[in-house]
Regions:
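Surface loop/turn motifs at the tips and blade-to-blade linkers of beta-strand repeat domains
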Residues: 6, 10-13, 52-57, 99-111, ...
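Residue-level detector of Asp-centered blade-edge/turn motifs that repeat once per structural unit
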Residues: 23-26, 64-67, 121-123, 187-189
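Short loop/turn segments that connect beta-strands within beta-propeller blades
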Residues: 43-47, 88-92, 140-143
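Conserved beta-propeller blade signature
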Residues: 28-30, 70-71, 125-128, 192-193
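Blade-loop segments of beta-propeller domains
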Residues: 1-26
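Loop/turn-rich, solvent-exposed surfaces of beta-rich toroidal or solenoidal domains
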Residues: 176-195
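Structural motif
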Residues: 37-40, 79-86, 133-137, 195
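Asp-box/WD-like beta-propeller blade repeats and closely related beta-sheet repeat scaffolds
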Residues: 15-19, 32-82, 97-106
C-alpha cells in the first residue's frame, strides 16, 4: 500500500526527503520528512494527508506511540546530536529527552553503524535497544521506558576501546571481539532473539 502514498515534491501534501515511516494500530501511515523536520500522517484507507506535526529538529528514526505522540532517536541540534532518545508531543511540540548517553565522552555519530534502527516492534510491544550496552527497553504508549531484557555477555565494548573506533570505519569492520550493534530483535512466546 505504500506505493499509493508516494508523493515526493514540495506541495502541501507531499514530502521532500523521506527519512523513516511507521504505521499505527488503525493502519494510518506516518512519514518523517527530514528536509522539513515534520512527521506527516496519511489516513487509512484514503491515504490523504491528515495532519502534519512540526518537530523542528532533525532525527534518524521515529515511531508513533499514538495519534500525536512519538519517539525520536538521535535528535540533532546545531552542534550535533542533542538527544539519544526523545519523546515528542505533537500537540505541545515539546521534545523531551528520555535516555542519557551511555558513554558521554564518545560521539556515537563518529562510530560506524551496522544498523540505523534501534526501535523494534514485536506484536503489540515496542522495544528500544541502547547501542553499545546490554540494555533492551520496553516502551509504553506514554513513552515510559522499562528495562525489559539484558543481553548477558562479557563482550561489550569499553568506553576507551569505543573511543578508538571514532572516525575509524576500517577498525570498526575489522574488530570482532565486541558486540557493537544489534540489527534485529524478534520475540516469540518462548524466545527473545537478538541479531
Amino acid at each position: 500500500f505504500l506505493s499509493s502514498i508516494v508523493k515526493p515534491g514540495e506541495g502541501p501534501d507531499e514530502y521532500i526527503e523521506l527519512m523513516d515511516m511507521d504505521v499505527d494500530r488503525e493502519g494510518n501511515v506516518y512519514i518523517a520528512d527530514n528536509a522539513r523536520m515534520v512527521i506527516q500522517k496519511y489516513r487509512f484507507p484514503e491515504w490523504k494527508l491528515d495532519e502534519t506535526f512540526d518537530v523542528g529538529k532533525h532525527y534518524w528514526e521515529f515511531c508513533c506511540l499514538d495519534d500525536n505522540c512519538f519517539l525520536l532517536k538521535d535528535v540533532f541540534g546545531k552542534d550535533g546530536m542533542d538527544m539519544k532518545l526523545a519523546y515528542f508531543d505533537g500537540k505541545s511540540h515539546e521534545v523531551t529527552p528520555l535516555v542519557d548517553e551511555a558513554f558521554p565522552s564518545v560521539n556515537e555519530l563518529d562510530v560506524m553503524k551496522c544498523s540505523k534502527f534501534n526501535l523494534y516492534r514485536s506484536g503489540e510491544q515496542l522495544y528500544y535497544y541502547e547501542r553499545f550496552t546490554p540494555n533492551i527497553y520496553l516502551i509504553s504508549d506514554k513513552g515510559e521506558l522499562t528495562q525489559r531484557y539484558t543481553i548477558v555477555s562479557s563482550n561489550y565494548i569499553s568506553e576507551s576501546d569505543l573511543k578508538g573506533l571514532q572516525r575509524e570505519p576500517r577498525k570498526y569492520m575489522i574488530e570482532k571481539t565486541y558486540i557493537k550493534d544489534v540489527i534485529g530483535l524478534f520475540e516469540s512466546e518462548e524466545y527473545f532473539v537478538c541479531m
